[in-house]
Amino acid sequence: KFELQPPPYPMDALEPHMSSRTFEFHWGKHHRAYVDNLNKQIDGTELDGKTLEDIILVTYNKGAPLPAFNNAAQAWNHQFFWESMKPNGGGEPSGELLELINRDFGSYDAFVKEFKAAAATQFGSGWAWLAYKPEEKKLALVKTPNAENPLVLGYTPLLTIDVWEHAYYLDFQNRRPDYISIFMEKLVSWEAVSSRLKAATA
């Protein structure tokens, strides 16, 4: 049985950029519902006892998702999203991460521009990701609709932003580009992204 994990900081820790009210609904209602519904769906099935990652890969079913896929992927995506942020985040990455960004996108500024564009142009609900492609040993930007994530493509997720309306509507209403800019400038945890890259390239 999966349990709803709290974000790695207090609910008001990302104020004023992400309000505790947003967390109350986004984590306390939406994320909780994905976990609760997943537990109901897998109870007593062959999926019971598998890791979240395994459930995602099995239920993706090569692009013809089985019923548990959406809740499993959304439970995973949200935990990953909370851990992609930190209080007093933003700034620029350093070390190997910055080297790969410069190599694969031309510059950090070019990467930010592309990431923001990917997040802003994801039509409807979904996610934008920085991912590592292990076969090519390269970074890539990925947009995914609804619950999908780069795991189903065989990529390693490094960073994500949630662009479902419930992620930003209480704080930014329909101003998705403003939310994306604040995420990159004030919230992103480059330490988390760097440690994920280190694990992916180990």
Curated annotation (Swiss-Prot):
It is found in: Plastid, Chloroplast. GO terms for cellular component: chloroplast nucleoid. One of its GO terms (molecular function) is superoxide dismutase activity. It comes from Nicotiana plumbaginifolia. It is an enzyme of class 1 (oxidoreductase). It catalyses: 2 superoxide + 2 H(+) = H2O2 + O2. Fe cation binds at H26, H78, D162, H166. Homodimer. Its cofactor is Fe cation. Its EC number is 1.15.1.1. This is Superoxide dismutase [Fe], chloroplastic. Binds 1 Fe cation per subunit. Induction: By environmental conditions.
